[in-house]
Amino acid sequence: MNSGIRVLRDRAAPVALAAVLALAPTAGARGQEAPQLNLYGVSGLIDMPSALSQPDGRVSATASHFSGITRGTLTFQITPRLEGSFRYAGLADLNYSGYRDYYDRSFDLAFRLLDEGRVLPAVKLGLQDFAGTGLFSGEYLVATKTLTPSLRVTAGLGWGRLGSYGDIGAPFGARPAANVGRGGKPSPGQWFRGPAAPFGGVEWLVNDRLTLTAEYSSDAYDLETGGSGASAILDRKSPLNFGASYRLGKRATIGGYYMYGSAVGVSLSLVADPYDPPVAGSTGPAPLPVLERPARSGGGAYDTGWTARAGVAESYTAQLAGLLKDHGLAMESLTLTGTTAELRLRNRRYDATAQAIGRAARAMTQILPASVETFRIVPSIDGLAASAVTLRRSDLEALEHAPDGAARLLERAQIGDAGRVPAAAMLAPDGFPSFTWQLGPYVSTSYFDPDSPLRARLGLELSARYEPRPGLVFAGALRKKLAGNLDSSRRFNTSALPPVRSNAALYAREGDPDVENLYAAYYFRPGDNLYGRVTAGYLERMFGGVSAEVLWKPVDSRLAFGAEVNMVRQRAYGDLFGFRDYDVLNGHVSAYYEFGNGFLGQVDVGRYLAGDVGATFTLDREFRNGWKLGAFATFTDASAAAFGEGSFDKGIRLEVPLSWFTGTPSRTSAATTIRPVSRDGGARLKVPGRLYESVRGYHRQVLEDQWGRVWR
């Protein structure tokens, strides 16, 4: 729920992601009950999977190594039953497919079909490496049963790689030959076909930290033992593996293993749980109390004669603006009548919009005269009035300390469209023009280059933002490299498409310092339920031009539609303000839908930066505390051959609010996107301040989800 939240995508996101996994404890009971992660980084035994699942929403990172085989895996428990993983593996000295050291990327999906009961085991169906090169491709059906509190057994049947040793035949027919091509495409015709082989194992939970495991593996490791012309890097003498894993407190697990009768293996797993932040509760300044008015029989406190006295309304405006500022809120305007007040404000501190609404309402009770009964609070982002929350002052007074006060206040609140600024609105003193600047570190990363799993650059970024009036923004950022190897990549454009993203290394090599962006933006409301944006300038590191967008999003609706058109030219590699000779007209029409339970869907159809036409499908899961994880895939008229390695654009993304780390309210979050490979097909323009995410957090669905924090 990051509307208007400052998202640090490539500036500090990689550091924050590492911190999420390294610093975040998991809940004691949840952590002890969670199954161990295997060497593939998924819930399992040692090298084989199990039917158990991680706690809902958990993010896990696992690094493992044995016999020249190194794997790094990010695993997401997408729902209580669905687990997804992205893996990057390196096989040293394999001498395969023209590479001495061979690197491979893969995706896994696993779905728990059956929960464990008193008699029946848990049952899971899984696809391993279902959309990669197929090097680790396999499928499985596995069951796990807890026999005693300290003893679990697992048995399963594997196909593909997991059916390559000790098979019992091919119950569903022969497995078609793999047609990997450029990789990156699922091959459903192969799934659960070919030889099937049993696997299994036993886990002994010695105590709440130590687990001993023994397993029988159905993976023959044909390639790693010298098959298909590769060098033998593993001597597979036995199908048996033995291991011990040990929990280091609540956030990490280490493991040691004896693999296949010949090799020693090690692993390290780090986990983070969105339901259990490092800091329990919420820190920061306490909210103001609701100031109760005197009884109506107590004199003239409710008289509205103050409205006729010169300067009184202006005095209330100045006092309220100062009090709001002390609590991280910025007034844009205040409109007063004898009985109503409309406050337009910017939320500069609270990641939960409902908390900002509650703090503003409390401040209004402190300042405004007793005759003002109706508070209409209009949150604004970039000058866009996003919604209007109307509260009765008497409800605030009556429900502040009620056990179910938040729920009852929500029942009585009205949430609707903001409408236009009233003609009698008084602008906040010192509100505009507004100028802010910041100097700080940034980290840019490149993940999973086939020649190197991680490249990074550390530097300083100077950013500034000037707003002469609501809705008009001038902003920019300048970067200077301090250290890193982001410019060492030698992989450049090899596809048939224009190099709109694949030449990123040239920008890193020749652009130092570089203007990350420099633009002007105008935000406006063309009508009820409508939002508009026009942005012009150097929009991102690789492109500059003009972008225009309109969004239809009623406050009460789960559904939204948007349209965006961009006319852009590619920026020069090393010239701060120059351009290259490639320009493109691109844009999309978009549909957004909030399914409920935190799931958000988005479909974008249109023309991409390389001129290809198609659609992007995105599904995110958002937690009430602001965590968001999701996946996307783009399909265009660019063929797999034209796209190059990976066949089509796809990836996963994770966003974590800073407040989750600190317990202190903050509008900043860290986000990172992981693609198996970055190519030119399906590439979209990166425009600051797109409308949907800017306004959605102030609409009914998000406000209701967060309303429990209205009194905090």
PLM segments and residue spans:
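Outer-membrane beta-barrel translocator/channel fold
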Residues: 89-108, 112, 124-142, 146, ...
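Membrane-embedded beta-strand positions in outer-membrane beta-barrel channels/transporters
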Residues: 47, 60, 71, 106-108, ...
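Flexible, glycine-rich linker and terminal segments associated
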Residues: 33, 182-186, 190, 194-196, ...
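Bacterial N-terminal signal peptides
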Residues: 14-24
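Residue-level detector of the transmembrane beta-barrel scaffold of outer-membrane proteins
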Residues: 60-62, 73, 83-85, 122-126, ...
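Transmembrane beta-barrel domains of Gram-negative outer membranes and organellar outer membranes
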Residues: 29-135, 147-151, 159-161, 175, ...
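Bacterial N-terminal signal peptides that target proteins for export
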Residues: 2-16
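Short loop/turn motifs that connect adjacent beta-strands in outer-membrane beta-barrel proteins
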Residues: 30, 51-56, 114-123, 134, ...
